[in-house]
Design a protein with these regions (language model features):
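Cys/His-rich Zn2+-binding cysteine-cluster or related metal-binding knuckle/ribbon modules and their
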Residues: 2-8, 13, 17, 25-83, ...
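Extended interfacial segments that mediate partner engagement and assembly in macromolecular machines
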Residues: 26, 76-143
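Alpha-helix N-cap/helix-start motif
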Residues: 41, 117-118, 149
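Acidic, metal-coordinating catalytic cores used for nucleic-acid/nucleotide bond scission
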Residues: 143-150
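Conserved small/polar residues in nucleotide/adenosyl-binding loops
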Residues: 151-156
C-alpha cells in the first residue's frame, strides 16, 4: 500500500521542491493544508499566484520589485555612488534589516562554481561592470569568500 494517496503525494512533492524543505516538513505542510478551510487554501493560492505575477526583478540591481515599479525603490531613492555587491535577494533583506546601509545594491544571482557549470557568464557581472562609472565612489563586495572565487579572481 502507498504511504499517501496520489493527491496528497503530489502536494508533498510540490512542497518538497522548496529550499530547505525536506520530506517530513513537506508532509507537515501538506497535511496542515488539508486542515485549512477552503477559503484559507484559496487565499493562500491567490497570494502565491499574485506574488508570482506582480513581483519582477529590478532591471538595474536585480532585486525584487513590484511590476510597474522599475527600477526598484532602492535604486530610485538611494545614494548610487556606493554599490554593495551581494549574492541574492536574501542578502539584501539581511542588510536592510540593519537600517544602516544607505547605498544601492547589485545582486549577482549566485556564486562562482565551476564544478556546477557556473562561471562569470552565468552571473550578473557584466551588468555590474556597466554600473561602475566615474560617479561611483565605492563598491563593497559583501559575498562569502570561498576558495573557488579567490582562485578565479587571481588566475588570468
Amino acid at each position: 500500500m502507498k504511504e499517501f494517496i496520489d493527491p496528497i503525494a503530489r502536494l508533498i512533492n510540490q512542497f518538497n521542491k522548496l529550499p530547505a524543505v525536506g520530506g517530513k516538513t513537506a508532509q507537515r505542510y501538506a497535511l496542515k493544508s488539508l486542515d485549512m478551510s477552503e477559503g484559507e487554501v484559496e487565499e493562500f493560492a491567490r497570494v502565491l499566484l499574485d506574488t508570482k505575477k506582480n513581483v519582477k526583478y529590478c532591471s538595474v540591481c536585480g532585486n525584487f520589485t513590484e511590476a510597474g515599479a522599475d527600477p526598484c525603490d532602492i535604486c530610485r531613492k538611494r545614494d548610487s555612488s556606493v554599490i554593495c555587491v551581494v549574492k541574492d535577494a536574501k542578502d539584501v533583506f539581511a542588510l536592510e534589516k540593519t537600517g544602516e546601509y544607505e547605498g544601492v545594491y547589485h545582486i549577482l544571482g549566485g556564486v562562482l562554481s565551476p564544478l556546477d557549470g557556473i562561471g562569470p557568464e552565468q552571473l550578473r557581472i557584466k551588468e555590474l561592470l556597466k554600473r561602475i562609472t566615474p560617479e561611483v565612489k565605492e563598491v563593497i563586495v559583501a559575498t562569502n569568500p570561498n576558495a573557488v572565487s579567490y582562485t578565479h579572481l587571481t588566475l588570468p
